[in-house]
A protein has these predicted regions:
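DNA polymerase processivity clamps
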Residues: 1-16, 20-75, 90-205
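Short low-complexity stretches enriched in small and charged residues
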Residues: 85-87
């Protein structure tokens, strides 16, 4: 199994994927620039072979017209934070949402945010989710989605970018947003092996 983790201190992405074969185990920290290049070079199909030794990692993959592409990167110094302690457990509330509807509604609400107020508010009521955003500079927007939710009303606010970006990377029709309250980290996940930990923001409402 290969586990990929990335964080900027305000959000964290975690993805597990199976590997066909491995001759050992280990871990390393890749620079952000290397990850950016890998995203451009990695084919949608085919194999990617990963080698590492000491402070270097090598990636070998198929390129255009059958050519082989090799990327060599230095590994960063230091010890990566214990990401397992960051992933929230025993979350009280799980919201099941249509990925596409949730993504598009967030993107529309995001248009009404500004640099000073880059926040969207989610209010989970009886079988519905209300997404709203407002700013002095742009205006305000509100949209309601139908969903399955029974129980007390829950309200939580996020930087919309921290939800929109992971939603764009997922293929599942349904996603799950899990939380305890408006102050604690929330977990966005799909049925596939991808999880995103997102810190909530304070809302002016």
């Amino acid at each position: 199994k290969l586990t990929l983790v990335a964080t900027d201190g305000r959000r964290m992405a975690l993805c597990d994927t199976d590997v066909e074969s491995a001759t050992g185990d280990g871990q390393g920290i890749l620079p952000a620039k290397t990850v950016s290049e890998l995203r451009k070079l990695t084919p949608l199909e085919g194999e990617v072979k990963i080698y590492w030794e000491g402070k270097k990692a090598l990636f070998r993959m198929d390129g255009p017209a059958g050519a082989e592409v090799v990327l060599i990167s230095k590994l960063m110094e230091g010890v990566y934070p214990n990401y397992k302690q960051v992933v929230p457990v025993e979350l009280k509330h799980t919201m099941t949402l249509s990925r596409e509807e949730f993504l598009h509604a967030l993107a529309r609400a995001q248009l009404m945010t500004s640099e000073r107020s880059h926040v969207v508010k989610l209010v989970f009521g009886q079988n519905q989710l209300t997404i709203s955003a407002k700013s002095m500079e742009v205006g305000e927007a509100q949209e309601t989605l139908v969903m399955n939710h029974e129980g007390p009303e829950l309200s939580i606010s996020f930087n919309p970018t921290f939800l929109v970006e992971p939603l764009k990377t997922l293929d599942d029709g349904e996603v799950f947003l899990e939380m305890n309250d408006e102050f604690s980290p929330a977990l966005l996940r799909a049925k596939e092996n991808a999880q995103f930990v997102v810190m909530p923001m304070r809302s002016s409402d």
